[in-house]
Regions:
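C-terminal membrane-cytosol helix-exit motif in multi-pass small-molecule transporters
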Residues: 173-174, 178, 196-223
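Helix-to-loop junctions at the C-terminal end of transmembrane segments
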Residues: 78-91, 297-311
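Juxtamembrane intracellular "pre-TM" segments in multi-pass secondary transporters
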Residues: 9-26, 211-253
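Cytoplasmic helix-loop-helix junction between adjacent transmembrane helices
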Residues: 125-161
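Intracellular juxtamembrane helix-capping segments at the cytosolic ends
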Residues: 50, 133-147, 353-366
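Hydrophobic core of transmembrane alpha-helices in multi-pass small-molecule transporters
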Residues: 37, 118-133, 339-353
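C-terminal ends and interior cores of transmembrane alpha-helices
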Residues: 100-115, 321-334
Length: 379
């Protein structure tokens, strides 16, 4: 029967499309994961050394907090431009551009530490934050082709891979410092020599291997399914209006933003706090590694929980865990590195719950045409 034959043909075509999308999604997850291993190695090493380097170059410990502040500021300022770049040209160009800018930032950090110039150093750290923004947006790139039931798990797989580079990164601080000294630079700046090298490889990998582009493919599939052209890219005002119009999106936005603010506020001063307690780079590196392990290591379980019991429940668990870690960190003396490590581990787990579940909730709570800009605005 003609109608039956047409239905069978349509079913077979849908199956082939789904199978092709599945293969592309698996490849996308592999490429993003490998890039984040390399990028995570660089970024987490910078967390360990940024504040110490600012204090060393400026000669003022009171300015140490500006190191991580500059990185976070750079990530925040560049998040929306990178999202717009991705919306126009695809994730491949957006992410590779972010990593490339981070490499330039790492080079400026080295120049600023050698000069020495605190201003150039802070400018480099700010530009280095663009690589952080690219890493954060990678988790959203992992969901472009995800079926609705797998958004949390696909996102968390990519976040989990960050843990490999991020946990190792702080522990290469000492050999990286030796590299800096061998080059005649302030020792801590060697961390950024290693960081820049890792991010270069991440940029090249994304640029060459993230094909077909997941965002452009997802957009094309939607257009074919609906028969409609893609709507124009929304303005920043329209993006925030779209987030504000959806209660789940508002919760997701608040979860990601507030969790990140609380986490960074405590993490940024930990190396200096431990330094005041007489601990060296090795202990600082271990504590930051424990913190980063909490942030990323359990993300697959967090993503699975978000898909199974709901993102809101996981966000609530994360908020309570962060509160416990924050109280412990606030009361821990600088000599108690173990207590500080436990506090930052709890802080990391809570951040993971709020960030992974919040990002998954945001992705599912805004229309497809708003997603890249909403994701960038949230970051």
């Amino acid at each position: 029967h003609p109608s039956y034959a047409a239905a069978v043909t349509l079913t077979e075509k849908d199956a082939r499309v789904a199978d092709d999308a599945g293969r592309v999604q698996r490849r996308t997850l592999v490429v993003l994961s490998l890039a984040l291993v390399l990028g995570g190695l660089g970024v987490s090493g910078a967390v360990t050394g940024g504040g110490l380097l600012v204090a060393e170059v400026s000669g003022r410990e009171s300015l140490a907090g500006l190191g991580q502040t500059s990185v976070v500021l750079g990530a925040a300022v560049m998040a929306v431009p990178l999202a717009r770049l991705s919306a126009r040209f695809g994730r491949r160009i957006g992410l590779a551009s972010g990593y490339a800018a981070g490499v330039v930032g790492a080079a400026l950090v080295v120049v600023g530490s050698a000069a020495p110039s605190t201003l150039v150093l802070l400018l480099g750290l700010t530009l280095f934050g663009t690589a952080v923004a690219a890493g954060l947006q990678s988790r959203f790139a992992a969901t472009d082709l995800s079926p609705p039931a797998r958004v949390g798990r696909d996102l968390s797989v990519v976040v989990w891979m960050t843990s490999v580079g991020a946990v190792v990164g702080p522990n290469v601080a000492q050999p990286a410092a030796a590299t800096g000294a061998a080059l005649g630079l302030p020792g801590v700046s060697g961390i950024f020599v290693w960081s820049g090298a890792g991010i270069v490889v991440a940029a090249v990998l994304v640029l060459l291997a993230l094909r077909p582009d997941p965002l452009l493919l997802a957009r094309r599939r939607r257009a074919e399914a609906t028969g409609a052209d893609d709507p124009p890219r929304p303005s920043l005002r329209a993006t925030f209006a779209g987030i504000g119009a959806s209660p789940p999106a508002r919760l997701a936005f608040a979860s990601v933003v507030l969790a990140h603010a609380a986490m960074v506020g405590l993490m940024v001063m930990t190396p200096l706090h431990l330094d005041h307690g007489g601990h060296g780079l090795r202990v600082v590196g271990v504590v930051i590694s424990v913190h980063v392990a909490g942030m990323y290591l359990f993300s697959p379980l967090v993503g699975a929980a978000a898909d199974a019991v709901g993102e809101v429940a996981v966000i609530a668990i994360g908020a309570l865990t962060m509160a416990a870690g924050g109280v412990l960190a606030a009361t821990a003396p600088s000599t108690a590195s173990t207590t500080v490590g436990v506090a930052l581990f709890l802080l990391g787990i809570g951040w993971s719950c709020c960030s992974v579940a919040g990002a998954a909730l945001l992705t599912s709570s805004v229309p497809p045409e708003l997603r890249p800009s909403a994701q960038g605005a949230t970051d």
